[in-house]
Curated annotation (Swiss-Prot):
Protein name: Stress-induced-phosphoprotein 1
Residues annotated with Phosphotyrosine modification: 354
Keywords: Acetylation, Cytoplasm, Isopeptide bond, Nucleus, Phosphoprotein, Repeat, TPR repeat, Ubl conjugation
Entry-annotated residues carrying N6-acetyllysine: 8, 301, 312, 325, 344, 446
All copies of domain STI1, residue ranges: 130-169, 492-531
Modified residues (Phosphoserine): 16, 481
Classification via PANTHER family: STRESS-INDUCED-PHOSPHOPROTEIN 1, TPR REPEAT CONTAINING PROTEIN
Gene label: STIP1
PTM sites of type N-acetylmethionine: 1
Keyword Ubl conjugation: yes
Length: 543
């Protein structure tokens, strides 16, 4: 037994010095002498992990658990090896199993949290794995009809379970449409050069992670450092920051290769509001971590703390920079959420800083000049810039709507008119320009409604009265072919949505076969509204 301990100590020293092969040889010889010693397998597992032989590290981790199933360290070794092998689900289960035996083991707890974060990240990166997948596909008319095809559902399930097959399925137009819906991006409108799907970039090489130290075999200085750290943590929780700093400083002196003690000091200065000192210590911790091949997750935490310090000072650009550095080391939902929050605030700040009513007026005048000359595209650019400079000026939206109408972009004109009316409900030009766009689209019923709203505001408004009369006459004299009616109606997004709804199509079929069914359906206000819309555009008629 004395020879076993000598070999174990010799192996520990070799591993600490970086002589991995010598350490493995010592542990293996010790195991031959004492094949039931769980600590030896645990230490050899750590050595294999440091060497990069993760399969053997996993096998020794399993043997450790087999020999001592109530020892948390064995589960930690096994799970760490599984993590290196990218078997995250198994690693998560191993951490959970270990916690059944040692419920308060901090390494197992942290390992489980990291695995849950990694698994959540994987789901986030696979759009076909979102929890409300079918609900989202059902709510979009582009994919709703596809769901009735069993082969389509089978394809979706295949990509849900094996996202790596996506590259081979991109030629299927159904998949491109589905990605457009799930990602909220119009993939079909890309330039021709972009239409060929480029394969995703290869994943970055996995960073080697330093295996955990062996608690039972730590050198005395490291054991003392851990005790000082615990004392510091207790003081930190009590907000006795000066005492906490003393203990962390002592821990750092005892074990200068461990970056954790430095990041703990940084956390204290963060709480004290000394953000410059916090950042200085985090940078130092990162340097120490790099030198000693520290776990990338610890490096990520240090970068995230720098980001948090800048966030506290409302320096959002710097915060985003360091959050992204943290995410490059290790993606966690918390840091990602914080980064997105900072980006949102920064974007809003930049938008507000851009507002300048005087410059908006200059751009508006330039737009008016171009409009008078008939240069509508240039006028639209000036009005757009004016809107960015003064987004609360309703008249700017009205002017740009006039440009869109001249350029036959009626849907965009309607959108600007709606914004104009929302900002200034009594501005009559917002209504007359909206009605003019609807009239140009030959949607006379809606146009008359809007002209009437303008007349309600000013009954003497000749532009509105004339428009109302024109629409009424056009509606009366309309002799469109059924094909023209259908084509014009189906250009309306609202009609498209109604007609692609399987429930509405079933109702329309019932109405054709049994006209008496109409009265029942009209009792439902939502259905009644949809039927009225189809009547307004001329797709159906009730006699």
């Amino acid at each position: 037994m004395e020879q076993v301990n000598e070999l174990k100590e010799k192996g520990n020293k070799a591993l600490s010095a970086g002589n991995i092969d010598d350490a493995l040889q010592c542990y293996s010889e010790a195991i031959k002498l004492d094949p039931h010693n769980h600590v030896l397998y645990s230490n050899r597992s750590a050595a294999y992990a440091k060497k990069g032989d993760y399969q053997k590290a996993y096998e020794d981790g399993c043997k450790t658990v087999e020999l001592k199933p109530d020892w948390g360290k064995g589960y930690s070794r096994k799970a760490a090896a599984l993590e290196f092998l990218n078997r995250f689900e198994e690693a998560k289960r191993t951490y959970e199993e270990g916690l059944k035996h040692e419920a308060n083991n901090p390494q197992l707890k942290e390992g489980l949290q990291n695995m849950e974060a990694r698994l959540a990240e994987r789901k986030f990166m696979n759009p076909f794995n979102m929890p409300n997948l079918y609900q989202k596909l059902e709510s979009d008319p582009r994919t709703r009809t596809l769901l009735s095809d069993p082969t389509y559902r089978e394809l979706i399930e295949q990509l849900r379970n094996k996202p790596s097959d996506l590259g081979t399925k991109l030629q299927d137009p159904r998949i491109m449409t589905t990605l457009s819906v799930l990602l909220g991006v119009d993939l079909g409108s890309m330039d021709e050069e972009e239409e060929v799907a480029t394969p995703p970039p290869p994943p970055p090489p996995k960073k080697e992670t330093k295996p955990e130290p062996m608690e039972e075999d730590l050198p005395e200085n490291k054991k003392q450092a851990l005790k000082e750290k615990e004392l510091g943590n207790d003081a930190y929780k009590k907000k006795d920051f000066d005492t906490a700093l003393k203990h962390y400083d002592k821990a750092k002196e005892l074990d200068p290769t461990n970056m954790t003690y430095i990041t703990n000091q940084a956390a204290v200065y963060f709480e004290k509001g000394d953000y410059n000192k916090c950042r200085e210590l985090c940078e130092k911790a990162i340097d120490v971590g790099r030198e000693n091949r520290e776990d990338y997750r610890q490096i990520a935490k240090a970068y995230a703390r720098i980001g948090n310090s800048y966030f506290k000072e409302e320096k959002y650009k710097d915060a985003i920079h360091f959050y992204n550095k943290s995410l490059a080391e290790h993606r966690t939902p918390d840091v990602l959420k914080k980064c997105q929050q900072a980006e949102k605030i920064l974007k809003e700040q930049e938008r507000l800083a851009y507002i300048n009513p005087d410059l908006a007026l200059e751009e508006k005048n330039k737009g008016n000049e171009c409009f008078q000359k008939g240069d509508y595209p240039q006028a639209m650019k000036h009005y757009t810039e004016a809107i960015k400079r003064n987004p609360k000026d309703a008249k700017l939206y009205s002017n740009r709507a006039a440009c869109y109408t001249k350029l036959l972009e009626f849907q965009l004109a309607l959108k600007d008119c709606e914004e104009c009316i929302q900002l200034e409900p009594t501005f009559i030009k917002g209504y007359t320009r909206k009605a003019a766009a609807l009239e140009a689209m030959k949607d006379y019923t809606k146009a008359m409604d809007v002209y009437q709203k303008a007349l309600d505001l000013d009954s003497s408004r000749k532009e509105a009265a004339d428009g109302y009369q024109r629409c009424m006459m056009a509606q009366y004299n309309r002799h469109d072919s059924p094909e023209d009616v259908k084509r014009r109606a189906m250009a309306d997004p609202e009609v498209q949505q109604i007609m692609s709804d399987p429930a509405m199509r079933l109702i329309l079929e019932q109405m054709q076969k049994d006209p008496q069914a109409l009265s029942e359906h009209l009792k439902n206000p939502v259905i009644a509204q949809k039927i009225q819309k189809l009547m307004d555009v001329g797709l159906i008629a009730i006699r």
